[in-house]
Every structure is written in C-alpha cells, then in structure tokens.
Amino acid sequence: MTASRVRVSHVGIAVPSIDAALPFYRDVLGLEPGQPETADGATIVALALGDVHVELLEPSDPDGPVARFLAKRGPGIHHLCYHVPDLDGALERCRAAGYRLIDDVPRRGAGGRRIAFVHPKATAGILLELTD
C-alpha cells in the first residue's frame, strides 16, 4: 500500500448532545449536517468538510463506547479514521507488526462501511479507525 492511497476519512468527536454541539458546526462554520444514524451505541451526525467529515457522536447506549469515553474523558476527539484501499491487508500488516487491534476482523459501521479499530496503545494514544 502506498501512502498516497491512504487518506483521512473523518474525525469523530464525542459530545453529550448533538443538538447542543451542532450550532457551532452548522451556523458558525457553515457545514451541512447529514441525517442522524445509529451505530455502536451512538447517534452519529456527519458534517462534510471537503473530502473529510466531522462526525458528532452522542451516546445512545449508556454502556456503549461513546458513553464510556465521555464518562472517563469528557467531550472531545474520540477517534481519527483513515480510508485505506485494502482494509483486510492493513489489518494483516498490523497483526504481523504486533499492533493491538480492537477489531480483529472488519465489521459494519455507520453507513454500512467496513471498519476496524486499532487500539490507542498501538498508535500513540489515538484511537484509530480504518475503513475501505
């Protein structure tokens, strides 16, 4: 895989309330919100920023990962997502290099995309999502 084929897909931001967070992105920055989706115990609203998206993540499950993140760290950047041309190959290279994965095999995320998360202990403290 060449680095030129990898790109930033989106940044996920954990918020207690999308309704409270949305005015800044919509009214101040002029970003257009998409339709809310539910995945992984969270309501997700994506806002296009060129080829990159900002995802606002509000917990819909009190025991889900976004709720746990907010309880431990408060609102803020939850994850960074990279689009890779070959998700299965990227996960295999992670395993071969000894990087800790949260998802050993791809699963379906928001919008039906194939996704997998790499543990923050493997990536300098940043939760990374990979998608193809």
Where are these regions (language model features)?
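N-terminal beta-strand motif that seeds the catalytic metal site of vicinal oxygen chelate
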Residues: M1-A20, P75-V84, D132
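Vicinal oxygen chelate
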Residues: M1-S4, V45-A46, Y82, L91-D132
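Conserved active-site tyrosine of GNAT-family acetyltransferases
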Residues: A21-R26, C94
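An N-terminus-focused feature that recognizes amino-terminal "leader" regions
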Residues: F24-V28, D40-G41
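Conserved acetyl-CoA-binding loop of GNAT-fold acetyltransferases
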Residues: D27-G34, A97-L101
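Conserved short beta-strand elements that form part of the metal-binding/catalytic scaffold
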Residues: E32-A71, G111-D132
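Short, solvent-exposed interaction modules
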Residues: L70-A96
